[in-house]
Structures are given as structure tokens and as C-alpha cells.
Amino acid sequence: MNEDKILQMFFDIGQWTKAIEKGVLKDIRKDQLIRLTDEHTRMAMAYAMRRGKYEISPPHTAQIPKDNGEFRTVYVNEPMDRVVLGIANDLLFELMPEMLHSSCKSYQTGIGCGKVVTEVSHRMTETGNSGCLGWKSDLSKYFDSVPIRFIDEAFDKVEAKHGQSALIDVLRKYYHSDLYFDEDNRFQSKYQSLKQGCAVASWLADVLLYDLDRELSQMNGYYVRYSDDMLFIGKDYEKAMDTLQKRLEDKSMKLNPKKVEYLAADVWFKFLGFSIKGGMVSLSSSRIKTFQHEIERRTIRCRDTTLAKAVDAVNRYLYKGEFSWAIQVLPVCNVKSDLNELNKFVMDCFRAIQTGRCKIGGLGYVRTKPDGCIVRGRGRNVKANRDKTDRDIPGYLTVGCMRNALLTSRAVYNTLVASL
């Protein structure tokens, strides 16, 4: 029997240790994870894969709300399958780096949306201040519309380099299966394309447009793609758009016409959860609303809370943990007036708890503002609450203070967080 290099790497103990640690963080059932720590379980899986008897179970669908009020269908795998597919996804990225173009930034360790947005802002500043500078676009139902032949071709390339593998057979079989359970637990059949929600969908989403990424990145301008979001800034932006549409048509795909936007240096536009205007970066409208909701539910919408409890809850949300709000937002957003508006809203929520008067207005988004994009709806109790309470809130460190700490060093920031 020929050696199966990919399967050997798949069952490397280091891969499983990392995957099980991820599983704990993702709240996969502990009894399932414990089973996977047993060597006999993994040996049985390997034996079944070699014999062609191992199958990924049909997923069940879930509806995830989108910013526009619609819902996105995702395919959720069973707990053990999530671990298996997660390892397979990591392995595919490791085995085939040449299938991933440098202009594609999604789903890769160490490259978050913030880094991409910061780079885009710098490029906007370098390009100039007048007229149309480029475009941003969104693929229409990318995860649902890629024909199976392109998915097969991606797996073919892996085996052409590393040899035939039982693991790739498992993945092919799963991607050729149309079976799933709907939200009412009814057994259904429908072509699922990349199967959004499946871990391997992230690798496929990155590599399937390699040729397009390469072609657009060679034009006169700056091109970047994050999954199904694309952006081009530079002189060749019209040529780039024509090429993009032609190449997508060749693959039976298309752009979402509602999401194509031409960019100017003096108008805010939204990209990857942020808003950009030249060298200025702030939050997108959906992220502003999420911020308001998260602060309110820990303060003025939390029954029987006290100021001390609310301050602790808000500090945890804003500052504590590796993936806290501050870590994701503050190194990227550079519009001080917008950050001040967010901070004033937080402090007004704290003051409302002290006075019991909670009509304090909300936060909004205006893309035509010259110096920012966040606006505040003034509530009738704001001025009175400020007059009746102290200027400082005990135990709360302001957004501006924590941003300065983060920009100084992560160690300074961590010291302040530890003091809360």
C-alpha cells in the first residue's frame, strides 16, 4: 500500500492537541473532546478512512442574521466532525501555501480585518484626494455558488503535489453530498457549494480565486481580497472591474450589484466592519449599533444592577481577554472625536444608573460628516444626569486612556487591565 503522507500528518498528535484546545474555546461538548483524546478512537478513525468507510455526517442548517436584516444560511457540523474538519483545514493551508495569493488576507493566523483596513487607509492617502480612487465589491452568494468542478480541482492540486490521500477522499465525498438537516430537523437535499460554516470552506474560499487575485494584483493599483469582499484602489480601477466581472462569469459567479461602490477620498465607506475616509478609520454602522447594544445590556437595560456591577461588566466587555473589543478596535480606529462619542455614551449609561433617569439617546452613523462618522442622539436626561453626578466614574478607565495605553505598548495596556 502506498504511503499516505497527508493522512499521517493529519493524525500527528500536535494537530490534535491544538484542535482539541480550539474545541474547548469553541464550546464543543466536553464528552466529545474527551473521546478524541483517546488514541483508540483516533486509530479507529484512521482505519475507517483508509478503508473508505469514514464519512462526515450531514450538517444541520442555522440562520445567521446579516447587517441588512436578512439571514445567511450556514451549515453546522456535528462536534467530532468540526474537530476533524478544523484539522483538515489547518493542514490544507500548511500543505499548499502556493495556492493562496498574497493579496488574499482572509482566515489566516496573524492577519485580522484591522490590519487590512489600516493598509487600505494608507493606500487611500497615497493615491490622492480627488475624483474616484477605486472600488469595493462583494461576491454574490460566493459560498453558495461555486460549481463542484472547481472544488474538485482544488483537491486535485493537493493530491498532485502530495499524493493520493484517504483524507482528501473523505473531503471530496462530503462536498459531493447534498444531504443536510434543516432548522426543523427534516432531512433535505440541496447543492451546498462551499458549505459555509464548515471549516474547510475557509481554505476553499481563499484558494479558488487565486488566478483572479494574481491578475488583479498585477494591475496598476492596490488590490486586496478578504473572502468575498474585494477592493481595488489605483489608476487601473476600471480595467480591474471589467476583468473581475469577466473572470467571475467564467466561473459561473457574479458580483452583488448592491455591494459595488466606487470610492472617493472625501466620503466615508464601510469595509470589513470599519469605516474609512482617506487616512481616517472609524467603526461601521453595524458595529456602532452593536457597541450601543452591548453597553446598554450591561447598564441601563440590566435590571437591579448597581454602578459597581455595571462598571465591572462594561470593563470586562471592553478590555478583558485576548479578543476584547478594545484589542480589535482601538489600534485601528484613529478618529478621536468618534472614540470620544463612544466614551461619552458609556459614561452617560453609568450616570443614568446613578440617577435612575435612562433617556440618554443612542449612537448613529452619518457618512457625510467631515471629521468623523459617529453621531449622538441627545436624550432628555443627559444634561441633568451630568449635572447631578461626579465627572469621573470610579473603577472605569476611559476609551481614550486605554487607546493611549495600547499605542504605547501591550504591556502597559495589560497592566491597566489587571488593575481593574
Predicted regions: what they are:
Residues 123-227, 231-247, 251-253, 257-258, ...:
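Conserved polymerase palm-domain catalytic core
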Residues 1-44, 357, 400-420:
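Non-catalytic, polymerase-adjacent accessory regions of viral genome-replication enzymes
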Residues 3, 89-147:
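Active-site-proximal segment of RNA-dependent polymerases
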Residues 70-101, 190-217:
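Conserved pre-motif C helix in the palm subdomain of viral-like polymerases
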Residues 82, 86, 185, 189, ...:
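Right-hand nucleic-acid polymerase module
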Residues 21-33, 64-75, 101-103:
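Glycine-/proline-rich flexible loop or hinge segments
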Residues 47-69, 83, 168-184:
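Reverse-transcriptase-like RNA-dependent polymerase core
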